[in-house]
């Protein structure tokens, strides 16, 4: 198998006879695997293979390269292996081998052959009985007993014995045959069509329908078949009992098969097909060359007298007349006798013999007579008889093997009686011209049909009317052109004849030729004349002629281009004209499906739901930064429709919205019972009441007066969406109990309220700023690339100029050398051949090896350079792709935070919407115009100045340019999405074309959710409509996005989790009350000290069902809290304690009794209001909110669970921890100086709280100063006697109650609800039974546990220095591993080393406790960490310091957040039992606090507030920037 060169296969190079040596290089062609030792032969063969001169043998495709033709043949080979059954190979190749018919007829012939006969080896089904089949294989085909062709032949010969009725019989047979021919033709066409698309088994119903195509019946052969599963042979099985199991190949596969395995030798019509030798031997195909002696041309050449007699027969046998073209008349002659006499030489060529020679069946395959092709066809068309039936009959003969002999014998048309030799004799004018009879002559003399008639000369177009005869060359050209006009394989011969005629004929002879031929000959003569003149020209003349021709060609191209541009401009002008859509006629818009809403929801609210979901998606970076599950429209619709299924999902949406709203400055004035709403815990169970409190109109009015800005006036109208009646309804009902319409209006009101917050404004500004930065980077990158291209172009231009100058010099030198060489060869002496000895051979080999080595090194160097260049290009490409992706993302985000606008409107003013992926599909909105929308357009002016054509063209060109600029601006601008509704249509110059307005009606939403509907919509939109043209452009631009969105609609929506809202609220209210009580009891903050009392309280809460019962329980819980541990509006007003001792101190101002009474009354009133609200609560969410207020008013940071040693800052070892009875600070016994050996009896005061007189001056730490610094900002008042009494009473239970300080409400007082850990604290519960407590024991101070015996100080020190337990060792090892990983984390670079004074001058002033990762490593080495909690506290300190010192937009904070995320992830993997919770630093001005906390965060906050008051903000900001810059530089230097 190899591609053809011309018409012959091109042989491949034989493989190498010997394998190559170790150092020998072999050149191999990739696709053919041909190997060459000679590089020149290899390159020559490659060049040959690269030319487009090859033809694919299997498909016939020409003008291919060798590789393309080779690959096509490989594809055809694979196709035939898959599609062509092996049992059809032999019967088809037997027909093809040595056949001479064209390919199309050959394909028809073999295709019908395999359709009407089973092949040997074919597997089929044998029908046994009515319903049983057996799988069999054909092993033998029996020949037909009585072939129908022979019977038909005998019958037709018997019908045509009478010589007198020759003509009549022929005409009758033609009339009878014509309908049969048409029927056969239609049957054959349907058969070939059915073969391509029929299944493997035909349905039985096809036999009954006469009008439909039916598979041709199998010939009545009998077959011997062999059972597949058994070794048995069944003989003489009729064809009707066999059924094919595999469909035979179609005509196209058959065509590929014949081309692939056979080749036609020669270009003539009788050229035989020859099968490959291997297949001839494999299938033993018979040769048919002996039958080629029956060629009719050879027969006529051996019988010249027959030919002459047939032309001028005096016996009176009429001949067929040629058709007169000018008059349109024709004639025909009578037939001669049909008897065959092979011995006589004077018998004319009868139609029977002619048909035998024209269609001869040799070994089952017909042979086509070698003739001139078109001459026969033209003669057939010129005969007056039945040309259509003749044509169809001829086709039928060549394609239907069953009826070939029958039709060939007796149904030969009249057109076949005129031979080609006669035609040539008439055309050549060498014989005396015969008169041709017409039908009129025959009609006048019917009796003389057998006698010779007087012949008349017929006028033909090919003969000249002048007396001077044509030269032989002209006659030969005329005859050849007439016979072979339009034939592809005769073009070369015709071209050579034209050239000869152009040279031989004179101008007069050329002018006498027919018009078509005269034009061809004249062109060829002009071409030859031009070549002759070109050969006589000098070089200068040739250059001038070429230059002139080039100019002419350029001028023609310019003119054509100008005409094309004018036509395109005209088309563009016409297409750019816009008309009112409803005035245009076009396709109807497709009918879209109404969007399916869940049961109970009207279709009109879909727009509002889509707005809410789209708002949540567009602002997901602000509203849901860490949420992995987006809120979709389908899920939200289901949540709105169902109560049980929608409780969790709807409340989640409300929590997301309120989280942003309550944290904004806009909501600072939102409060309830003098407590800001932001301080109340926001959960799924309290959100319903918090929504009501946020949407109260009073808050909006207060905020309006507070802001005093005009933009609030426009937003205040959104409060009208939630009426007062609706808010009153929310007081008695939960959100999930509302109607769907009310739920949607609630969500809309929240969205509009959030849109007016400062957070949204900052978010939009940040997104746009990022987009602008990306745009600047993109512009800079493009500019840099353009500059680089410009520089490369300039450099290339300079190199070209240098190269041109060099080429001129080289040419001049070469010219000189050539002239010298021409002169010197005669003078040069004869060179003697150098002797070929061993030394010269070795030397030449060494030189060749050195040269090869150099070439190899050069090649390696070039490969290395090329690979480096490719790697650099790949890196640049990836970088560009990443930059482009980042830019597109930034632009997309910037567009998302703006107002979503529709894609456009159609002729009926329906709007088309494409949302994000959370609202999949393309939506159509009808009835969107209502009374509040002012839709208007400007009518065109009535009178316009009349413009000339040129002015009109200029005006249109300007308009087009303006339109294009406007479109570019609209696409490129981000803010263009926020245009007004009236500007959504066409550009401004086209807006005046509109003459219709949208009609008001019901707002309905339709959806386009299939690609077919979308494509139909695109086709139906009119491109010249003022609205639909813009809509079509937008749809085409977003085509892929719309298809993606349509595809998302097919995905199933997971159902929502069902949940009973009432039971959920009830369950969590019980758990929250129990949790608060548990924390009070474990932290020693309330009176629920007895375990049995707490368990009784817990059991009582679990049985509660009604809200009033829960209210009484919550009130009882509030009353059980020790008053000194209350804060906020529940905190009692305390007296400031007087300082004692000899030190000078400023005396606090005495509080006026009236002010004190007023303050007490205010507190009592606030608490009473809260209790009243608890008793009157009508919803569980309201009760959750009021319980959250109580939780926020408890000082949880004063709980005993949070006790931490003031000296070492560590928790743990509770039995060695003692609490001060004055300030509630904790100390380890062994951390005090001097250390304590045992828990002292009675009250114990820490060194900071001891009186000054009782203390001696110490060189150690100044605890008094520490305490004073902590208490500078506190306001203390003396407590009332009642409080002291309660304090005394509570002391009997084992507690030492001290005067606590009131802490102003802040975010630190709000604790997240979580189950309290059980703590074995004996300091707060030395004895749970008060009756058994002695006065001595009650006088003991607070301690973790009273030791049973006195403890020696050495023992305490030994215990303190004792190594930690094994579990703590494992935890610390894991902590050290975490630290090592954090050190290697790429974003931790700002925290690896301490901040020096050079980097930030004021860092030590702002940050009181600096910490870094290197210092922590040092702590691990020196074993300063005793537990994982110490390590976590230092990590918190690093992050808190970074938050406090750096500005919000700095890179350090970004690195901090990523480092903290990585740390939390590592901590959860390594230490899953250790929790991590860090309080975020509030960026608010700190207010004086009444209480000093143990935690370092409070001290740092006080320090920050003091520094801010001292006016160091500016210095701090500059230092932040400075440290950030210096740290970034350091990091970049290390990276490099």
From Swiss-Prot:
PHD-type zinc-finger residues: 1202-1252
PROSITE patterns, A to Z: BROMODOMAIN_2, DDT, WAC, ZF_PHD_1, ZF_PHD_2
Entry's localization field: Nucleus
Keywords for this protein: ATP-binding, Bromodomain, Coiled coil, DNA damage, Kinase, Metal-binding, Nucleotide-binding, Nucleus, Phosphoprotein, Transcription, Transcription regulation, Transferase, Tyrosine-protein kinase, Zinc, Zinc-finger
Basic residues bias spans: 1297-1316, 1506-1524
Single GO biological process annotation from the record: post-translational protein modification
Xref: InterPro entries: BAZ1B, BAZ1B_Bromo, BAZ1B_PHD, Bromodomain, Bromodomain-like_sf, DDT_dom, WHIM1_dom, WHIM2_dom
Record field: compositional bias (Low complexity): 443-452, 1325-1350
Name the UniProt record assigns to this protein: Tyrosine-protein kinase BAZ1B
Domain Bromo: 1366-1470
Cofactor(s) needed for function: Mn(2+)
Biased composition (Polar residues): 344-355
Protein task: Atypical tyrosine-protein kinase that plays a central role in chromatin remodeling and acts as a transcription regulator. Involved in DNA damage response by phosphorylating 'Tyr-142' of histone H2AX (H2AXY142ph). H2AXY142ph plays a central role in DNA repair and acts as a mark that distinguishes between apoptotic and repair responses to genotoxic stress. Essential component of the WICH complex, a chromatin remodeling complex that mobilizes nucleosomes and reconfigures irregular chromatin to a regular nucleosomal array structure.
Known EC number: 2.7.10.2
Reactions mediated catalytically: L-tyrosyl-[protein] + ATP = O-phospho-L-tyrosyl-[protein] + ADP + H(+)
Subunit structure: Interacts with smarca5/snf2h; the interaction is direct and forms the WICH complex. Component of the B-WICH complex.
Organism annotation: Danio rerio
Domain DDT, first and last residues per copy: 603-667
Lineage: Eukaryota, Metazoa, Chordata, Craniata, Vertebrata
Pfam families: Bromodomain, PHD, WAC_Acf1_DNA_bd, WHIM1, WSD
Biased composition (Acidic residues): 941-955, 962-972, 1266-1287, 1491-1502
Similarity-based family: Belongs to the WAL family. BAZ1B subfamily.
Any GO CC annotation of this UniProt entry: nucleus
Domain WAC: 25-130
Description of its domains: The bromo domain mediates the specific interaction with acetylated histones.
